[in-house]
């Protein structure tokens, strides 16, 4: 079965960045620690504009992603983050190939 990948790009209001960072930290950690089907949850920042945040999430399957979306921590993040962002876009992918990742 191919893994399901989600990329979400947020543009965060500058005055809300500190709170957004706290919220996404909680959500990312809860996702990888408590969801068996969440393999990866990376939070990336644009190197020139810290208000642009990219999430790179890898799940065992679309069903695992649906489980993620139903979780309390995800719902709380989405509700709390909504007033903090200027825009949000998402892209859904199927992982075709990935070489073995090195632990760093």
Locations of regions flagged by a protein language model:
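N-terminal first-folded block
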Residues: 4-34, 38-39
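Short flexible/disordered coil segments
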Residues: 8-9, 13, 71-72, 96-104
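Intrinsically disordered, low-complexity acidic/polar segments
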Residues: 17-19, 52, 64, 99
């Amino acid at each position: 079965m191919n893994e399901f990948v989600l990329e979400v790009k947020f543009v965060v209001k500058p005055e809300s960045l500190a709170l957004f960072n706290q919220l996404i930290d909680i959500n990312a950690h809860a996702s990888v620690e408590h969801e068996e089907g969440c393999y990866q949850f990376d939070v990336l920042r644009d190197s020139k504009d810290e208000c642009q945040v990219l999430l790179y999430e890898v799940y065992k399957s679309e069903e695992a992603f649906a489980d993620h979306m139903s979780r309390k921590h995800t719902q709380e993040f989405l509700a709390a983050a909504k007033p903090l962002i200027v825009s949000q876009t998402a892209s859904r992918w199927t992982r075709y190939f990935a070489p073995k990742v090195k632990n760093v």
